[in-house]
From Swiss-Prot:
Identification of the protein by name: Cancer/testis antigen family 45 member A5
Family: Belongs to the CT45 family.
PANTHER family: DEAD/H BOX POLYPEPTIDE 26/DICE1-RELATED (PTHR12957), INTEGRATOR COMPLEX SUBUNIT 6 (PTHR12957:SF2)
Keyword list, A-Z: Nucleus
Residue numbers spanned by region Disordered: 1-27, 82-118
Tissue occurrence: Testis specific. Expressed in cancer cell lines.
GO cellular component: nucleus
Compositionally biased residues, Basic and acidic residues: 1-23
Compartmental location: Nucleus
Entry-linked InterPro entries: INT_SG_DDX_CT_C, Integrator_subunit6
Encoding gene per record: CT45A5
Amino acid sequence: MTDKTEKVAVDPETVFKRPRECDSPSYQKRQRMALLARKQGAGDSLIAGSAMSKEKKLMTGHAIPPSQLDSQIDDFTGFSKDGMMQKPGSNAPVGGNVTSSFSGDDLECRETASSPKSQREINADIKRKLVKELRCVGQKYEKIFEMLEGVQGPTAVRKRFFESIIKEAARCMRRDFVKHLKKKLKRMI
């Protein structure tokens, strides 16, 4: 008996697995491990996230030089959750509350500065959501009709959109919904 254990300990290649065992963990276990990795990788504070985004910008060469980056990161290290500034080595507060200098106008300007979506992008997004909603089991067509009203463009584009959704509904065996869509299409034309 000791010969077999010594042989297994020395040469693990001779050990065979059972037919159902595999090297990789199960799908559910991989999902749990990925979720844990995301939680650990995300960090617990916004400070870490902002510092990491600055490092990414630095790596791509679009933003801040290293000397300024270090000073900006050092500025973030002294804040606690309640807004009091602290010395890096101690937990004693140094000054008063820190306030933000952003106004509502700044946020509006940033939102308008971002690139607006084109009609095609909006319509493609609506179509993707519609197909997803069609495939769901249930008779809640109000949400689908609301999304169809959001389609942008001339009537020819809307007509093509309706026709493609009718085909998808027919493919998903939604006969009653196809009837409703055809009625709406006739009213639109």
